[in-house]
């Protein structure tokens, strides 16, 4: 006795489910790297500018604490990308701790994840109580993270003066 395509939809498993699991795993790595780089930036910024507040002085952990530093110390108060990132991090946490379920342990839907499903119907899909990651989801999320980094860069980099060619 073994697995056959009569008792299990092997096509669905190998073309949708396994790729989704791989994408979920990649999302954990991507966000882990992003959190690490944001933390390194905050520590470096604090040293370079001898700030009164360090990253360790702030509550929270991971990306949330890094953003709190960027908001309070660096001064990026109105990030357009950060609200989107908070939804993606909710999804990441569900992937890491709850098998990518869109419901919490008390069976209540997680609003941020439901909003992502509504916002990206071609990239994320509901499979019962789980979220499936389709092709393109990670690239879309990477673009959101890139937008956030560009906001930080634009905020900390003074506008360049273009030299005048004529007096």
Q: For each of these PLM feature ranges, what is it?
A:
Residues 110-120, 154-167:
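C-terminal/domain-terminus segments
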Residues 133-163:
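A hydrophobic membrane-anchoring alpha-helix module
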């Amino acid at each position: 006795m073994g697995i056959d395509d009569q008792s299990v939809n092997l096509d669905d498993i190998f073309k949708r489910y396994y790729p989704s699991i791989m994408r979920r795993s990649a999302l954990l790595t991507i966000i882990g790297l992003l959190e690490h780089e944001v933390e390194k930036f905050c520590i470096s910024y604090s040293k370079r500018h001898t700030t009164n507040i360090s990253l360790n002085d702030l509550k929270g952990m991971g990306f949330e604490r890094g953003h709190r530093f960027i908001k309070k110390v660096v001064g990026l108060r109105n990030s357009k990308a950060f609200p989107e990132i908070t939804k993606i991090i909710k999804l990441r946490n569900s992937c890491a701790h709850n098998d990518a379920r869109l419901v919490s342990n008390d069976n209540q839907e997680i609003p941020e994840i439901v909003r992502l499903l509504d916002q990206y119907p071609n990239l994320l899909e509901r499979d019962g109580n789980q979220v499936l990651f389709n092709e393109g989801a990670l690239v879309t999320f990477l673009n959101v993270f890139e937008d956030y980094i560009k906001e930080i860069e634009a905020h900390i980099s003074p506008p360049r003066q273009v030299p005048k060619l004529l007096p």
